[in-house]
Every structure is written in C-alpha cells, then in structure tokens.
UniProtKB/Swiss-Prot annotation:
GO molecular function annotation: transaldolase activity
Function in brief: Transaldolase is important for the balance of metabolites in the pentose-phosphate pathway.
PROSITE patterns: TRANSALDOLASE_1, TRANSALDOLASE_2
Family the UniProt entry places it in: Belongs to the transaldolase family. Type 1 subfamily.
Taxonomic lineage of the native organism: Bacteria, Bacillati, Cyanobacteriota, Cyanophyceae, Synechococcales
GO cellular component annotations of the record: cytoplasm
Superkingdom of origin organism: Bacteria
Name of protein: Transaldolase
Catalytic activity: D-sedoheptulose 7-phosphate + D-glyceraldehyde 3-phosphate = D-erythrose 4-phosphate + beta-D-fructose 6-phosphate
Subcellular location: Cytoplasm
Entry EC number(s): 2.2.1.2
Annotated NCBIfam families: PRK12309.1, talAB
UniProt keyword terms in alphabetical order: Cytoplasm, Pentose shunt, Schiff base, Transferase
PANTHER family listed in its UniProt record: TRANSALDOLASE
Amino acid sequence: MESLLNQLSSMTVVVADTGDLEAIKKYHPRDATTNPSLILAAAQMPAYQSLIDQALTTSREMLGTSAAKVDVVKEALDELCVVFGKEILKLIPGRVSTEVDARLSFDTDATIEKARKIIAKYNADGISNDRVLIKIASTWEGIKAAEVLEKENIHCNLTLLFNFYQAVACAEAGVTLISPFVGRILDWYKSATGRDSYPATEDPGVVSVTKIFNYFKSNGYKTEVMGASFRNIEEITELAGCDLLTISPKLLQQLNETHTDLPIKLNAQKPLVIEEKIHLDQTSFELMMAGDKMATEKLDDGISGFSKAIDKLENQLNERLELIEGGVALTL
C-alpha cells in the first residue's frame, strides 16, 4: 500500500511548512510556506549563514556606505526573507509564501507598502507574481490591505486565521488563499477545557477548517483553503481533499512512513451546504471577533510571537553585520 503522503498528494496539494531547504529537497512539495519563526530557525543553521551574509551585503550596497546600520538591518530583514524564498523556488514547481512584517498587522497602508516592496524584490530577479504569495495576518486591516494588493495582481495568503468570520471577510475581499490554523485552535481548547485530547473528527481545528471549506465551495468562492498548523497526522488525514495543506517536515516524515488507506474527507465538487452566504463590514467583523475569545487570543498571540521572532532576527542580523563591518554592536 502507498504511504499516506503519496495518497494525500493525489487529492490535496501538499505544501512544506519550513525554511529548511534540505527538508524541501527531501519531500518534493508543490508549494512552500515560511514565516518569521521558520526563517529565524533556519537562520540559526550554519548551512544558511551565506544567505544571511548575502542579504546583508546586498542591503549595504543598496543603501550605500553612509547608511546607518539600523537601516541596513531593516532592509536586510526583507532581503533575507526574499533570499530564502528565491532559494526555495529553485526546488519547487509552485509558489512560496513570504510574510509581511507582523508588526504591521494593524496598519493597512504600511502592509500594502511592504508587500509591494517584497514582490518588487522577487520581480527584480525575474520571478513572476504568480509564484509568490504575500502572507498577511487576518486582521481587518490586513484583509483590507490584501483586497488592494489582489487588484494589483499581488497574490495574498491570509494567515493567523482562527475563525469562520475571518475566513468570510477574506473571501469577500477576493484574496487568493487563506491559511486557517488547526493545531493552535486545538491547543487553546485543550487548555480551556482541561482535556488531554480530541478524536480527529471532533478536533476543534479540524471542525473549523471543514466548515470554512464547505462554506467556500458551496458559495462559489475562488479563494483557496490551505489548512495549517498541525499537531498530528490525524488532523491532516481528516482534512484529506482540502485544497492545500501545509505540513512541517516532522509530520511529512510520519505521513511518508505510514501505510494505511486514506479516504477523501473533503470534496470541492460535493460540498456540504451549511449556510447561505453572509456579508461582513468592519463593525460586524469586529463584533464577531470580540465574541470569540479563542480567535481573539490566538490572533494576538500569533502576531506577538511572529513580532518577537522578527525582533530576534533583526538582532541576529545586526550582530552579523558587526562581524562583517566591524565596530560596536548596536542594540535594536
């Protein structure tokens, strides 16, 4: 019998959730996703120090010798994310997701500006917009930024998505893809209820993605659904048939080593009609979020976590720049 990974690949686009190029080479995904935490983890690996140096050198050359180190580091942060993205694109046939600075999550204009800057860096190296997804947190401000960007043919992946109403707002904005989180929802419910586990069919994260998928398909939305943030392979197999699933190398390995039958669970051609199409404005969106303690807490936690990862990455870049150029290290 074929592995679960091979069977899953026949019904769902498998995406690698990592910045580790060696893991991507091993599992041959179609697409790949990165985020600040994954880039930070990869940047700790000796194998990727040359990419850090490349980002710093390019940024210094771009800004000039008179530019302050703090400005070079900030430029290098964007450059490093794109450098990793370009290396990933050499290994996959599809798209890479590169994330906008999470510290801009509540600033629509700044998010738009940063996204344009990121895509321009890819374009300058001959990479078309169709091969890049700009990851943006699913705040109201982020969703509105994505709505503008999509009209400019800059494709967006709305991340840190924890409830149905975030998904609806994204679909109404016409975004290319959403990343509803599974494992982080499970984490919250386990902590809130004191339960050690949930059967996969009752897993709150699985239930959430299933509802979103069926709503999108039954109402004709083109926005792709990519389940994310998995804690075990049972969550993944329960979502077999979802448009895409982005999976960590550890769970990709488990799927590759497990041989059992995998039935399709989600079918875009035969969605369950769960409710009629609804419409959200900013007021109704914020009311729905305010009434969902889990989604509000996890969105805030996610933005905070990614922001801290960016701070750490900037500090690492600063230290590396000091080694390259000499002088006293600057605390950012």
